[in-house]
Amino acid sequence: MGIRGMLRAAALLLLIRTWLAESNGPSPTPKFHFELSSSTPEVILDLFNCKNCANEAVVQKILDRVLSTYDVRLRPNFGGAPVPVSVSIYVSSIEQISEINMDYTITMFLHQTWKDTRLAYYETNLNLTLDYRMHEKLWVPDCYFVNSKDAFVHDVTVENRVFQLHPDGTVRYGIRLTTTAACSLDLQKFPMDKQSCKLEVESYGYTVEDIVLSWEDDNAIHITDGLHIPQYTYLGRTITSKEVYFYTGSYMRLIVKFQVQREVRSYLVQVYWPTVLTTILSWISFWMNYDSSAARVTIGLTSILVLTTIDSHMRDKLPHISCIKAIDIYILVCLFFVFLSLLEYVYINYLFFSQVPRRNHRRCRKPRRVVARYRYQEVVVANVQDGLINVEDRVEDRAGPLPDSPMQAHLASQESLGSLVFTSEQAQLATSESLSLLSSASSQTQLATGESLSDLPSTSEQTVPECTIHFHGFLTNDSIIPIKIHSRSDACDDEDSEESLSSEESHGHGSSHTGRLKLQISQRCVQEASWDLDKIEILQDDISITSSWLGLDEQCKGDADSIWSLTDEELMACDQEKDSSSESEENCSPSPGCSFNEGFSFQLFKPNRVPKVDRWSRFLFPLSFGLFNVVYWLYHVY
């Protein structure tokens, strides 16, 4: 048999093979199997088998055959074992992770693979690739995304669906879609947070009795190279699966989690550095003078305003949730430091502008009170009856004739007065007989004996003697008995003193002596003598009298000069009774008997601490803020 005969036999067999492939039912003729020799070329063998070749007619015949009896409403192996469906995902992009909406958008290719024996074919070994039009003719699993908010299938330029049919009936279904899935973000460490956004795949209607979902393999999730997520860095992914139970049955759920970490560099530039610089700016006030109220308060308030603006800007980008974020703590601490700087200045302002000026104001009022002491005096006269005439005679002998002035002071005897010291005071003492002649309307006090009262002229133009009298005490047979005579000005305000001065000037020279020296005499704390006046002996050298004559104008000028030339010690002595309580509270340390609150208040509000507080704040504030930053960043970064 030659080659020609072999070719004819091969052509005949090929025709028979084609006829058998095109027939719908089983062939009534028996199938022959030819054992060709090993020397037969492979081309001849391919002509007989035809597994790797297919034309349009062959594919059309295959599709027509498998779809003619195919029911799309029934799952594969209906009534039998559940259909295993394997799932794989190829992630092309993660476009956005929104903190406000708590979701993220992902674009991916979803592939599902299952086996449907109704679609098996044997005409060829080639896989058949079919487009989106087969979606309505074939059964597909009803998978959906559990946490999806919105999703759509891309349809540019055509609907992005594809089917691959294998000869054994395996179907691989792929779809390109974009979905927006919910992502529960944990913002407690914002913006140094790490998030895990998951995507859940589940069958909508088929329970585990019909469909069993599973991941294709351990590498079922594929990520495109160079995946870039805005404001985040991709860390990795994990895949899990679990069975969930509902009222309609149990379902298999596939879960993939994408781990991402937020990039903090943008927040360092936009939030942290401005916040730190603003906080440091508020500390400039510690180097300013403590009486620069406007500058220090302006810096503090401006810093608070800037921090509040930054905080409001951040809140607009974040959801309104109840958890406290790390950036909230940082901004709040910065606000607290700025507030402490303002509070520190309030403390200094209270010490400097409240405590110290009060003491200075009282010191400025002391000369006025000394003037008031000259004008308003209370003279307490002891009950002395004898010896006034002798003292008067001695005063007249040493000082000369008395001037014709209503302001002349007639001195009492040594037996009746003791422990009196009048320095440049024109307070006139009178006997008990002359006390009844005092007139409150004229406010003049004239102390003299009965013989001298009739001789005093009433003119105001005569000169007034200036007398300095010192009484040391009385000597009895047994001991020296001092007599206490209290001289004290009335507690009057500065406004009353000024009104008295103005009214005094308005009366003119006619009443100058009367207006300048108003004496209010009241018998306070009068010590009644319990001794016998006859036993009182005059102490020698106990009275020293200095007398001189001054004109009225010179005396007024001299009085004013003597008042304003007083030293601090004299002013303190003159004002000791008025300000004893207030001075002791501010300038003296609390006694051991004081309560704890008083001692603590004294230690806390000492005026001399004003410069020290600023010096301490220059170091304590930066040190505390630096320590806070170390703890803050170590906790949230590592």
From Swiss-Prot:
The chain crosses the membrane at residues 268-288, 297-314, 326-346, 618-638. It is a multi-pass membrane protein. Keywords: Cell membrane, Chloride, Chloride channel, Disulfide bond, Glycoprotein, Ion channel, Ion transport, Membrane, Postsynaptic cell membrane, Signal, Synapse, Transmembrane, Transmembrane helix, Transport. It catalyses: chloride(in) = chloride(out). One of its GO terms (molecular function) is GABA-gated chloride ion channel activity. It is found in: Postsynaptic cell membrane; Cell membrane. Expressed in brain, lung, and spleen. Disulfide bonds join C183-C197. Residues 289-296, 347-617 are cytoplasmic. GO terms for biological process: chloride transport; gamma-aminobutyric acid signaling pathway. Residues 1-21 form the signal peptide. Glycans are attached at N127. Potentiated by etomidate, propofol, pregnanolone and pentobarbital. GABAARs subunits share a common topological structure: a peptide sequence made up of a long extracellular N-terminal, four transmembrane domains, intracellular or cytoplasmic domain located between the third and the fourth transmembrane domains. Heteropentamer, formed by a combination of alpha (GABRA1-6), beta (GABRB1-3), gamma (GABRG1-3), delta (GABRD), epsilon (GABRE), rho (GABRR1-3), pi (GABRP) and theta (GABRQ) chains, each subunit exhibiting distinct physiological and pharmacological properties. Belongs to the ligand-gated ion channel (TC 1.A.9) family. Gamma-aminobutyric acid receptor (TC 1.A.9.5) subfamily. GABRQ sub-subfamily. This is Gamma-aminobutyric acid receptor subunit theta. It comes from Mus musculus (Mouse). The lineage of its organism: Eukaryota, Metazoa, Chordata, Craniata, Vertebrata. The gene is Gabrq.
